[in-house]
Amino acid sequence: MAVARAGVLGVQWLQRASWNVMPLGARTASHMTKDMFPGPYPRTPEERAAAAKKYNMRVEDYEPYPDDGMGYGDYPKLPDRSQHERDPWYSWDQPDLRLNWGEPMHWHLDMFNRNRVDTSPILVSWNVMCMQLFGFLAFMIFMCWVGEVYPVYQPVGPKQYPYNNLYLERGGDPSKEPERVVHYEI
């Protein structure tokens, strides 16, 4: 028991001693630098120009989110367009996100990536889609009504049974010979 306790204390001492020398790999991989965080909301034209340069944008195109206390800071307000609308044949630096190096990402990129919301314009208007849907449903209801009013059956002949039309099974007298039933003529 004492050996196990000494081993645990030794491991804890080693962890504390190595903490100041070299941080764990998971902590360094998840660490964000100060350049990755948005800065304070730009109040002057010089601050707007510096923020536009920080995000590789022209000053004319740069517009920050409104300073409403949500913590957006100087991050640029990009148009709410999904990545479906971006050119799929362009040679992107990051093709799965359709982004180039240094290009600012949308604040809600997790919502506008290619397997989520598609904001690309639809080819058919909602009025036309609704007309087609309800027209098809009305046609199918009409056809079901016609089928109920005017039923159609396959023409059939009389039922034919083997063994002299099942004479014994239908209660015929076994002592009498049943009359022969011919189902066809050659």
Swiss-Prot record:
Q: How does it sit in the membrane?
A: Single-pass membrane protein
| InterPro entries the UniProt entry points to | NDUFB8 (IPR008699), Ndufb8_metazoa (IPR016551)
This protein's assembly is summarised as: Complex I is composed of 45 different subunits.
Kindly list the places in or outside the cell where this protein is found, as annotated in its UniProt entry: Mitochondrion inner membrane
GO-annotated cellular components: mitochondrial inner membrane; respiratory chain complex I
What keyword terms does UniProt attach to this protein? Electron transport, Membrane, Mitochondrion, Mitochondrion inner membrane, Respiratory chain, Transit peptide, Transmembrane, Transmembrane helix, Transport
What role does it play? Accessory subunit of the mitochondrial membrane respiratory chain NADH dehydrogenase (Complex I), that is believed not to be involved in catalysis. Complex I functions in the transfer of electrons from NADH to the respiratory chain. The immediate electron acceptor for the enzyme is believed to be ubiquinone.
Q: Where is the transit peptide?
A: 1-28
Where does it primarily localize? Answer: mitochondrion
Q: Which Pfam families match?
A: NDUF_B8 (PF05821)
Choose any GO biological process term that the UniProt entry carries and state it.
mitochondrial electron transport, NADH to ubiquinone
Which protein, by its recorded name, is this? NADH dehydrogenase [ubiquinone] 1 beta subcomplex subunit 8, mitochondrial
Transmembrane portions of the chain: 133-153
State the similarity comment: Belongs to the complex I NDUFB8 subunit family.
